[in-house]
């Protein structure tokens, strides 16, 4: 009898289910380390459960956020430095949640690639777990999509989904008024926005990713991959202390576009650009690209990753609390009648 012809398998089509299962087993310990009150189930089910009552909520309102990391991924892929890109993913979601006054509760990720490379994927998701643990947020599920023909070799994409909660009536912004003080919390670099511009500037400079960074630190690639700061525990401590009226996460759109998102109609903000020093990375970007200051201010965080809008009579106490939490805090301006953001002084 002729030998039976072997049929086509899913693996022959480029999808390795065994590799996907191996990834889940490898990341389970990291996910378990993110467990918090309210966590009911682990990875592997059709859905993940979370118990709001066990998390201590009486009359909760849920808040959801989703985001990605943009073209910062391209630098991580090209350099092979993927260990912290997951922290960026978490930060972009949970920092947004706290701006609504919510405590992050749980997180899910979506990881898509053309060919699953187990070590690469595990390093990325372990970074996600690290970000979750640092922000008190349980990593309770996710999706790994192996899609042959959709991505070049080694390429991948990430998306994150975070859910938080607050007691009814505790949402932010609330009570913002003229005279409120703006406290700026320092960023540690570009964070996760503006990287299409960053990559264009690097191209113009002629520098390779492994070249020494022209603005200090390690190689250029590693310096630009510094993970987005997590402001969750510090910001929530300030909110619970009383007097905080709003929080603004300074992401795409910079100071110019993000601060007005938390100001009610009829109110604007005045910011003193001389209150803090522009970090070297932004000065290098601006000088290399001959970038005008207004463009810089509506593209990057310019050294301020989160703004806390606080009642004037609580500003000193909240600043002291944030400093005790390890923050570098700068009084950068105030809320004024009007609209939009106006600037005094110069950054460049």
Curated annotation (Swiss-Prot):
<dbReference type="InterPro" id="IPR004733">
    <property type="entry name" value="PurM_cligase"/>
</dbReference>
<dbReference type="GO" id="GO:0004641">
    <property type="term" value="F:phosphoribosylformylglycinamidine cyclo-ligase activity"/>
</dbReference>
<dbReference type="InterPro" id="IPR036676">
    <property type="entry name" value="PurM-like_C_sf"/>
</dbReference>
<dbReference type="Pfam" id="PF00586">
    <property type="entry name" value="AIRS"/>
</dbReference>
<comment type="pathway">
    <text>Purine metabolism; IMP biosynthesis via de novo pathway; 5-amino-1-(5-phospho-D-ribosyl)imidazole from N(2)-formyl-N(1)-(5-phospho-D-ribosyl)glycinamide: step 2/2.</text>
</comment>
<dbReference type="GO" id="GO:0005524">
    <property type="term" value="F:ATP binding"/>
</dbReference>
<keyword id="KW-0963">Cytoplasm</keyword>
<protein>
    <recommendedName>
        <fullName>Phosphoribosylformylglycinamidine cyclo-ligase</fullName>
        <ecNumber>6.3.3.1</ecNumber>
    </recommendedName>
</protein>
<dbReference type="InterPro" id="IPR036921">
    <property type="entry name" value="PurM-like_N_sf"/>
</dbReference>
<dbReference type="GO" id="GO:0004637">
    <property type="term" value="F:phosphoribosylamine-glycine ligase activity"/>
</dbReference>
<dbReference type="GO" id="GO:0006189">
    <property type="term" value="P:'de novo' IMP biosynthetic process"/>
</dbReference>
<keyword id="KW-0658">Purine biosynthesis</keyword>
<dbReference type="GO" id="GO:0005829">
    <property type="term" value="C:cytosol"/>
</dbReference>
<dbReference type="GO" id="GO:0046084">
    <property type="term" value="P:adenine biosynthetic process"/>
</dbReference>
<keyword id="KW-0067">ATP-binding</keyword>
<dbReference type="InterPro" id="IPR010918">
    <property type="entry name" value="PurM-like_C_dom"/>
</dbReference>
<dbReference type="InterPro" id="IPR016188">
    <property type="entry name" value="PurM-like_N"/>
</dbReference>
<keyword id="KW-0547">Nucleotide-binding</keyword>
<comment type="similarity">
    <text>Belongs to the AIR synthase family.</text>
</comment>
<dbReference type="Pfam" id="PF02769">
    <property type="entry name" value="AIRS_C"/>
</dbReference>
<keyword id="KW-0436">Ligase</keyword>
